[in-house]
Amino acid sequence: MNFEEMMKELEEIVNRLENEDLPLEESIKLFERGVELYRKCKEILQQNRLKIIDVMKELEGEIDASGRDQENELR
């Protein structure tokens, strides 16, 4: 299951918990599933955040090494 699918399921769970009159056991199961999905989504976001930081650091290193940004050279 990818990030978007997990987020969609999580949104559906939240909607059901907020809008439906569910039995306690079903509510608890949905809540537990929601927490599981939240944790997985959070982990994916954290991993991607680190990737972005690494790419930005690499880009900054390239800019620092050349002394100027390629975009500025094109202007």
Swiss-Prot record:
Primary localisation category: cytoplasm
UniProt-listed Enzyme Commission number(s): 3.1.11.6
Catalyzed reaction equations: Exonucleolytic cleavage in either 5'- to 3'- or 3'- to 5'-direction to yield nucleoside 5'-phosphates
Domain of life: Bacteria
InterPro entries the record matches: Exonuc_VII_S, Exonuc_VII_ssu_sf
Record's keyword terms, sorted: Cytoplasm, Exonuclease, Hydrolase, Nuclease
Location of the protein in the cell: Cytoplasm
UniProt xrefs under Pfam families: Exonuc_VII_S
Record GO terms (molecular function): exodeoxyribonuclease VII activity
Cellular component aspect of the GO annotation: cytosol; exodeoxyribonuclease VII complex
Major enzyme class: hydrolase
GO terms, biological process: DNA catabolic process
Subunit structure: Heterooligomer composed of large and small subunits.
Family: Belongs to the XseB family.
Its biological purpose: Bidirectionally degrades single-stranded DNA into large acid-insoluble oligonucleotides, which are then degraded further into small acid-soluble oligonucleotides.
Protein name per its UniProtKB record: Exodeoxyribonuclease 7 small subunit
